[in-house]
Curated annotation (Swiss-Prot):
Residue intervals passing through the bilayer: 4-24, 30-50
Signal peptide, first to last residue: none
Entry keyword tRNA-binding: no
Official protein name in the record: UPF0391 membrane protein bsl6560
Cellular-component GO terms for this entry: plasma membrane
A Pfam entry, by short name: DUF1328
Family assignment from sequence similarity: Belongs to the UPF0391 family.
Organism, scientific name: Bradyrhizobium diazoefficiens (strain JCM 10833 / BCRC 13528 / IAM 13628 / NBRC 14792 / USDA 110)
Length: 57
């Protein structure tokens, strides 16, 4: 699950760079939403992983 979160985080960062750079102005809001969802999922996965005793990040 953590692998998917990291993948979506990278995709969101790329979309954010393209959107904030002016290449795709309409994707700014989508990139923001995807980025924050990815950050939340990453944090939840990290906390659950640490709570289970696994540190496989």
């Amino acid at each position: 699950m953590l692998g998917w979160v990291v993948t979506f985080l990278v995709i969101a960062l790329i979309a954010g760079i393209l959107g904030f750079g002016g290449i795709a102005g309409a994707s700014i809001e989508i990139a923001k939403i995807i980025f924050f969802i990815a950050v939340v999922l990453f944090l939840v996965s990290a906390v659950v992983g640490l709570a289970r005793g696994r540190t496989r990040i």
